[in-house]
Amino acid sequence: MGLAPELESIRRRLFRDIDRIAEALDGLDDEQIAWKPLATGSSLIVLITHVVGSAQNTVVQLVGDESSRDRDSEFLAPWTAQSARSEVEAAKARISAALERLDARTLDAEHAPPRVSSRPLTVPSVSTLSAGPKTSRDFLLQAIAHAAEHAGHAELTRDLVRAALPKGS
C-alpha cells in the first residue's frame, strides 16, 4: 500500500540523517569509532547507537507498541564497526513497519511523550519540545531534528578522529 506522502517524507528524512551517522563510521576501525573528542564526549558508535535507539523508541511507541529501550546502555557503545550497519538496517525496518501503521489522522492526534527508557536514567535526557500538548507529528519531527543534530555531530567527530587516530598509525 505504501506510506502517505507526509509519512514517506518523514521516513526519508529520518533515514537520511541516520544514514549520515552510519556513513561517518565507514572505513574506520573499532578503536576509531570508540574514540571520544573529550572525556565526557560521545564517540561515533555511541552517536549511532543512541540516535537509532531514540528514533526507534519514539516511532514504535507512537503506534502503541512497547519499547524495551535502555537509553543508558546506548552510551556504553554496545555495537562494533562490523555490527553497526546490520543493527541500523534492522532498526530502520522496524521503524518503517511502525510508520506503516500511522496515517494523517493519527499524526494529528495528541500523544503522551514516548517513555525514554525502561529504567531510571543515569545519563540525563534533554528534550527540546516546548510545554503543552504534542501530536504524533510533533514527536516525529523531533526525532528528525534529533537525528540531524547528531548527524552533524558525527561528521565533525569523524573528521576529528581521522586527525587524532589516523588508520594504520
What would you call each of these model-derived segments?
Residues 99-108:
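Proline-centered turn/helix-capping motifs that create local helix->coil transitions or kinks
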Residues 11-15, 19-22, 30-74, 113-169:
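Short, contiguous alpha-helical
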Residues 6, 43, 80-83, 87, ...:
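Conserved acidic
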Residues 1-13:
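Extreme N-terminal tail/first-helix region
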Residues 60-94:
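Helix-adjacent hinge/juxtasegments
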